Regions:
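N-terminal small/glycine-rich loop or linker at the start of catalytic domains
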Residues: 1-22, 58, 99-112, 135-140
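N-terminal glycine-rich anion-binding loops that anchor highly charged ligand groups
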Residues: 3-11, 30-48, 54-60
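Active-site mouth loops of central-metabolism enzymes
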Residues: 10-30, 75-84, 109-117
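Glycine-enriched alpha-helix->loop->beta-strand junction motifs that scaffold or abut catalytic
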Residues: 41, 92-98
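Alpha-helix-loop-beta-strand connector modules within alpha/beta enzyme cores
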Residues: 55-79, 118-140
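Catalytic cores of alpha/beta
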Residues: 83-94
Length: 140
């Protein structure tokens, strides 16, 4: 087996690390976190997600976070999007990259994104097409 010549590490703390916190973390603190990660050399940062605030209230301020961060050349600021509505938010927020998420099992898919694997793939298709038409890379 040949190992890859390089590895891409994506810092997920501002999104995955905070999304399940019971107490809402204010946008200025999230902005400070992203800025500190940037200043400490992280090149790929998942800064938020454009999901339903009903399901993930912690991410309701992702547009404010994306608007408030001090972007640095060479750093990719991505956001997670589950559907076209999320993509529109990511586009307006000038995300450098979007992330989509899927599941390997039907049970996890239903629990995590409230649909079957087949339905999730159908949702991702227009998101990926829209991202490509706007020159936005997709990770997932």
């Amino acid at each position: 087996m040949k190992l890859p010549s390089k590895v891409k590490i994506v810092e997920m703390g501002p999104r995955d690390g905070l999304q399940n916190e019971a107490e809402i973390v204010p946008a200025p603190i999230k902005i400070t976190l992203v800025d500190k990660l940037t200043n400490n050399g992280f090149r790929f940062i998942e800064a938020g997600s454009f999901v339903s605030p009903k399901w993930i209230p912690q991410m309701a301020d992702s547009s404010d976070v994306m608007a408030g961060i001090r972007r640095k050349a060479g750093v990719v600021y991505s956001v997670l999007v589950p559907n076209m509505k999320g993509f529109e938010g990511a586009l307006a927020a000038k995300a450098s990259e979007i992330a989509i998420f899927g599941a390997a099992s039907e049970a996890f898919s239903k629990k995590n994104i409230n649909c079957s694997i087949e339905d999730s793939l159908a949702r991702f298709e227009p998101v990926c097409e829209a991202a490509m038409s706007h020159g936005i890379p997709v990770r997932g």
